[in-house]
A protein has these predicted regions:
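C-terminal capping/extension of enzyme domains
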Residues: 1-12, 97-98, 156-178, 192-240
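A polyanion-binding, active-site-adjacent surface
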Residues: 1-181
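Short, solvent-exposed loop/turn segments at secondary-structure junctions
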Residues: 36-40, 145-149, 191-196, 218-222
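Short, Asp-centered acidic motifs that coordinate Mg2+ and/or phosphate
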Residues: 185
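Redox-cofactor binding/interface segments in oxidoreductases and associated redox assembly factors
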Residues: 188
Length: 240
C-alpha cells in the first residue's frame, strides 16, 4: 500500500530533507498543487499541520497505520483523529465566513471540494454537492512553496527571491524522486508560481511525467476557467 509514497520518504531521508509532502490519498489519480501553507512559520497552525507532515507520514508506515476518525473535540490533533490521509475530518461542506466557524473548511478547501465534486458528477450546473469535505479520498494536495505565509501581497524583492529559491529546491528533489510524476491529472492552482512549469516542457515532464496539466489561480476564490476543463479532466482520468 502506498509504495511510491514510502519510497519518497526514504529518498528524502537519504537527502537529509523533511519537507511538507501533502495531504490526501497517495494513490489518487489527481494532484492539486497550491501556492503555500497560509500558517506563518513558527505559528501554532504551522507547528500542528505543516512542520510535522513528513514525520506523520513516516510514522504511518512505521506502525501508526492509516486509520482516521472524526476528532472528539474540534482541532483534536491526536494521531488517528488528525491524519494526513484525511485531515480535519469531518468538516461540513459550507465555507467559513469572516467569523471562522469551527467545523467548516477554509475557502480554498471549499473550492477544492467544489472542483472534485464537479469532476465526480458533472459540471458547474449539474454537479452533486457533497455533504462534507471528502475530496481527500480522490486526490492528493501539496504546495509549491515551502515558505508559509497568509498571502504573497506586498512582498519586497528579497522576499520574492526567497520564494523563488524555495520553489527551486522543491523542483530539485522532485526531479530526483518518483512520487509526484505518477498522477494522471495535475491541477496547478498556484497562479504565477507555475509560470516556469508552463514555459518549460522538459521541466514539466521531469516533475509530473505524462500527466494532463491544468492551470488556474490559487483557489481562495473560484476560477471560472476550471468549468471548461472538467471534460478534459474526466477524459484523462478515464484513460487506462
Amino acid at each position: 500500500m502506498y509504495e511510491k509514497l514510502e519510497q519518497l520518504l526514504n529518498d528524502l531521508k537519504s537527502m537529509n530533507l523533511k519537507p511538507f509532502i501533502g495531504y490526501g490519498n497517495p494513490d489518487a489519480k489527481i494532484l492539486i498543487v497550491g501556492k503555500e501553507c497560509t500558517a506563518p512559520n513558527g505559528s501554532d497552525g504551522w507547528k500542528k499541520f505543516y512542520e510535522p507532515n513528513f514525520n506523520q507520514w513516516k510514522k504511518s508506515f512505521e506502525g501508526h497505520g492509516f486509520d482516521f476518525k472524526s476528532g472528539v473535540e474540534p482541532h483534536d490533533f491526536e494521531h488517528g483523529n488528525f491524519h494526513p490521509i484525511n485531515p480535519y475530518y469531518k468538516l461540513e461542506n459550507k465555507k467559513q465566513s469572516k467569523k471562522k466557524e469551527v467545523g467548516r473548511p477554509s475557502a480554498t478547501y471549499y473550492y477544492y471540494q467544489r472542483l472534485v465534486d464537479m469532476i465526480r458528477t458533472g459540471n458547474d450546473v449539474e454537479y452533486k454537492k457533497s455533504d462534507c469535505i471528502d475530496f481527500f479520498k480522490d486526490c492528493f494536495i501539496t504546495e509549491l512553496n515551502d515558505i508559509c505565509r497568509p498571502n504573497d501581497s506586498g512582498l519586497n524583492k528579497p522576499e520574492h527571491e526567497k520564494i523563488e529559491e524555495s520553489i527551486r529546491v522543491r523542483f530539485d528533489w522532485m526531479r530526483k524522486t518518483n512520487f509526484f510524476n505518477q498522477f494522471k491529472v495535475v491541477i496547478l492552482a498556484c497562479g504565477p508560481y507555475a509560470e516556469a512549469i508552463k514555459k518549460d516542457e522538459i521541466l514539466r515532464t521531469e516533475l509530473y511525467g505524462n500527466a494532463s496539466i491544468v492551470y488556474c489561480h490559487q483557489l481562495s476564490y473560484w476560477d471560472k476557467s476550471l468549468e471548461n476543463e472538467i471534460p478534459k479532466i474526466q477524459e484523462s482520468l478515464a484513460k487506462k
